[in-house]
Structures are given as C-alpha cells and as structure tokens.
Curated annotation (Swiss-Prot):
Source organism of the structure: Lottia gigantea
Listed GO CC annotations: extracellular region
Protein name: Uncharacterized shell protein 16
Tissue specificity of this protein: Component of the acid-insoluble organic matrix of calcified layers of the shell (at protein level).
Cellular localisation: Secreted
Residues bearing attached sugar chains per UniProt: N88, N139
Major site of localization recorded for this protein: secreted
Signal peptide (from-to): 1-17
Keywords: Glycoprotein, Secreted, Signal
Amino acid sequence: MWCFIVFLTIFLPTLEGQYGPAVTGPSLPEELCTKDPQVSRGRFYRLKVRPSFYRRAHPLQVELYQTIHAYGPIIADAYVHVPETAKNSSTAALGIKTLGYWLPKNPDNYKISRALSCYNSVWGNDAIVANSDRELKFNLTGIWYPPTSEFDLIKRPFVKIVAYVTPDPDVRRRRWYRAESQPIRNLDYIAFQHHMRRYKAQMKAFRTQLEMFN
C-alpha cells in the first residue's frame, strides 16, 4: 500500500493535471532565493549531516537522499540552504555573507550556482536550470563550511539545514518537497558560554574579596 501511494504521488503527475491542479512552485534558484515554494505533502527526502555539531573551520558533510528506492531515483533538483537564524527557515531571510559557504564534494553532480543573489545556498544536481531529459539521482552530497563571524561565535547556539527537492525534471511544472535536518549544535557557542560563566564566577569571587578588605 505504501509503495502504491508513493507511486501515485511521485510518478503519476499527469493524474494531477487531469483531476486537479498540481502543487507546483518556482523553477529557478533566483526565485527560491526570494520566496519559499509551496510544498507538497510527503516525506520522501531526508537530510543527513555529519558530524552532528559544528565549529569554525571544520566543514560538515551534508547528504540529501530519498527514502523510497522501489521506483528508482526521484531527485531531479534540490535547493539547499542554511537559514539566517536557527529559528527562521525562510529562504527570504537570507542575505548575510557571514553564514558560511558551500563547497561541492563531487562537482559532477553538485555544483554551486554563481547566479544566486542570496548567500549560503547551493543549487543541486548538475545545472542551474534543469533540462527535461536530465538524469535523476538517488542522493546529492555537499560540504558546508560554518561561519567565522563573531556573531555566530557568541549568538548562534545551533543551525538547521533546509532543502527543497523536486522529482520533476521539467522546469515548467515542478512539485517541491521539504526536508530539514536536526539542529546542529555550535561547539564554539557552547565553549563561549562556558568561559563567560567561569569569568562571571571569578569576578563575583573577586568582588567578594574586595568587600572583605573594605
């Protein structure tokens, strides 16, 4: 039954056109930079991030993969980004250059789009604009380098990575599905908070000693 539902949802888009409008959205990365696409129901894709924490100058491996393999690959394109704040998952909130950057692990199937007007984003698969006959894939893997700004060091306890994925190669009619990673803890932030608590405790003890001599 589960495989049958997946087949109807993913592999028979023509039925949507006959019995009702398909939930389609933007096709170009520039559009996704400014507005989140309308998302179809279904958890057919997931994000795996290794390791499960981050710190400055230590990259993360981000893998986007499909959860169903019975009918072959179903990743035509993917738009992956790290939201501006940990609690904000909107692509429209992007725009700060200090939010890290992407480096493709395999340039043949995961290229960075130079046409993007927003930062900290990557356009998946193998082109900025898809062709109707492009090859579908089971997964995409990229490398994300964490930010190095002081704000991220002392203000950002964690981040999440968000992906919008489409199984439709045809850019004229695309459905989008959303995948979100688990919170990725910021070790620099944790260490900074620890040092701040220790510093405040030392200052409190120092003031107590001064009061004893006065």
